[in-house]
Each structure stands twice: as C-alpha cells, then as structure tokens.
Amino acid sequence: MDRRTFLKGTSLAAAGSLLPLSGALALGATNDDTVSTGKERVKSVEELMTRKTREVIDQGLRYLAHRQISEGNKRGAFGTAGYAAGVAVTALAGLAFLCNGSTPVSGPYQKNIKLCTEFILKNVRSSGYISENDTTRRFSNMYGHGYAMLYLSQVYGMSKQRELEKKLAKAIKMTCEIQNNLGGWRYQPVARDADLSITICQVMALRAAHSAGFQVSDEVRTKTIEYVDKCHKKDGSFQYTEKGGRISLALTAAGVVSYYSAGIYEGPKIEASLKWIYNHRPGKATRQQVSPMNYYYAHYYAVQAMWHAQLQHPEYWNTWYPLIRDELIDSKRSRDGTWPDSRVGPEFGTAMSCIILQIPFNYVPVFSP
C-alpha cells in the first residue's frame, strides 16, 4: 500500500489546499539509488552513508543487542529498572534493528526483534493499553503506548502473527476511543486534554497500523488534522498545545510529521514549517530551540521531516542528513560507542541515534517517503 494514500479522503477535505504527493524512494534503497527532482539531485545512500557511519551504527546495534535481557521476567527489555525496562525503549530499540534490514524472520538481529515483540505483547493490557505495570516511570504512558503500537505495526506487516494482530487491534481501538474532542491525546489513556508531543506518537502509530491493514476511522483522521492545525503558528513553528506553550524544533518537526502521518504532504503550512526546521538545522539551533532533554526526540522527528521533503526540497535533505550524522558521531557519542542520555539512559539515546542514522537505508515502511 502506498503510504501517501493514507487518510487521503477526508483528510484533504479538512486540510483545504494541502495535497498529497507520490513516494520518492523504494523500500530498501541500494547504494546506487539516486532520485532526480529537476532541481538539486537527491544524494544517494552511498554518498550519505560513509564507512564510519556504518561502523558506528553496527557498534550501536551490537550494544543494544548485548543490553537486551534474554531470560526472566524482563525478557526482551533492555534493563531491569528505569526507562530501559519499559515498552518505549524496547520499541525504539526494535525499530533500530528493523532499520538495519533485519526482520522477525531474517537478519542478524532477528532474535532481538522477536524478544522485543515478545516483551511488548506481554505488556498489552486487556483494554489495549500497552504499558508495563510499573506506572512510576514517565515513559509508562502514552509515549510508550504510541512507540509500542508503531513498532508492532511494522512487525505485523512483516510477519502477520495472529496473537500480534489481536493485541494490536485492541491497542488501535483504545487509541481511537481516547482521542479527545479537540482531536489530540495526552500523557495518560483518558480523553481529557491534549498536547502535540503525545499526539504525534499516536497518529504516526495509527498511520503505521492503517498501512499494515488495520482500520482507522475517517473521523479520527480528520480530528487529528484539526488539532494539529490549532498548534500551528504563522511563522511555521508549532506550539506545545492548542492554547500555546513552548515552541521548539521537537514540536515543529512533530507537527510536520503529524501532517505526513495524516496523509498531508504539501501546502503553505508545511512549506513554512519545513523552512523553519531547516533554518534551525544542526549548528544553527539554539539551546532553547533544541534542549538537551529533548535532543533525540527532536532529531527523530526532524530527520523524518527532512527525509519526506526530499521531492520538494532535495537541498533540505542533502544538507540536513550530513549535519546530523556528523553531530551524532563526532559530538554526541561516548567513547564506548553509545549515545548517552542523562534522563532516560544510553539505551534510549543509542536506539534513537541508530534510527536517525539509518533513515537513508529506507527499510522500514512507516519511515518511507
């Protein structure tokens, strides 16, 4: 299924002049794959993926594989306590393995993907909420639920497991039911207030589920676009909630990817936001715009926004990826080959960095333009 047909019908009506595009690259781009847009040429995988980049990715993935627990109550997780023991980090690590080309049935990280899936499925509650029982961790909420649902959707598309299908269907149903009246989601699984940082996690997961063959109602899609519109500002940036709040690279990139996930790829709002993101590229953004606390979260969505924009603005992608690649490798990486995160931990930082660095491989459908 062409991911750019997702939410095509009612989403276009809700978004007015915003129009969808065709895809840019086939999944699993080879070293010789290059796209010409009639403007600047989109750089090939070989041009972007230096030898050093591949080496540090491999080192990061080996670290994650080593950290994964293979037996006991936390089998499949990446720690016995803290965020590493939760579904969010497990899902992100699983996505990092998938981004390398491994699947549930093949590849060097096949076993690790199976363990990630096993752990997440074990934590799907009867309501469909995906969360381990320890609710003291901040990621044991709708962040984790969204990342877990996104990961399971990708695995389901590759394996069609029956247990996975049943539990994922429950998670999708619950997510749709707790969307609030403004069209967004919040930290806990109740339909009260909303914010953009949580909404992106849910709408991207729903898009992935839809592409894997699950039903997502037009009403949910339309309401999501309406909520994202309320968070958009005239200068192209996005604010934390419809009422206001902080503005940052993380939120602006999340807003753009929310539009993409809702089937919207063009229009004045997206153009303004892409320009805003590009103007705050690595080396240009201030500490206020990209705080250390949200660094990986910001660049996880920013690299997707630039990657999806390559047909309209190949110069954005051609500039952005080398900048974030070099920053992650030369400035953010520890001597042991991991990416530290003072709040969540190196498992999280390493998983996020490996996803970001592997985007040009184009192996995972939900990340594909």
Give the residues covered by each predicted segment.
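N-terminal export signals
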Residues: T5-L27
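A non-catalytic alpha/beta surface segment that caps or lines the substrate-entry region
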Residues: Q68-A77, L121-R125
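Predominantly the C-terminal beta-signal and adjacent terminal strand-loop region
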Residues: I329-R333
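An alpha-helical repeat/solenoid feature that recognizes helix-turn-helix modules
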Residues: D33-Q59, A77-N112, R125-K173, E177-T222, ...
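Active-site-surrounding "flap" and adjacent substrate/cofactor-binding loops of secreted or lumenal enzymes
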Residues: Q110, T117-F119
